């Protein structure tokens, strides 16, 4: 009887030791899945960042857009001179927000590349700001982001079809 109890207790302790060791030293396969989950989490954070950035453009608060940039960040649109620093970026955002009081910016997609993140967007609104034409506009474009170590935009190079934009300002959306 003592021998059976000893065997049961020994087996129990060995099983417990294996379980504890396994929990403290995950297999390579489990470690790989942790890496994938971490990568997915980072992608999810970036996707959320993009959605919130688009929402900031809709807020009629230019400083909300600028807050997504590093304090020394830059924004250039269609290869024009970059706006550098949050105050200058807020001025660019204010220009669009004033021209389109009903501005809606939607994130169409966010594509992570080795050298940049591509933020694809569509802007819709009615040009009813001061000196506006009253025309409705719907234009799509992209910003190529370089992010800093804090996860803010350090550099954004934006582009959209300026000829189509100007046509829509005159006669509206097709």
Report each predicted region and the residues it spans:
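Bacterial N-terminal signal peptides that target proteins for export
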Residues: 2-10
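Bacterial N-terminal signal peptides
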Residues: 11-20
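Short, low-complexity N-terminal intrinsically disordered segments enriched in polar/charged residues
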Residues: 23-71, 172-174
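A solvent-exposed, acidic/Ser-Thr-rich amphipathic alpha-helical stretch
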Residues: 43, 62-114
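Hydrophobic pocket/interface hotspot
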Residues: 53, 65-66, 73, 85, ...
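Short beta-strand segments enriched in hydrophobic/aromatic residues
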Residues: 69, 123-125, 160
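Exposed beta-sheet edge and beta->alpha loop/turn motif
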Residues: 122-152
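Low-complexity, intrinsically disordered terminal/linker segments enriched in charged
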Residues: 154-174
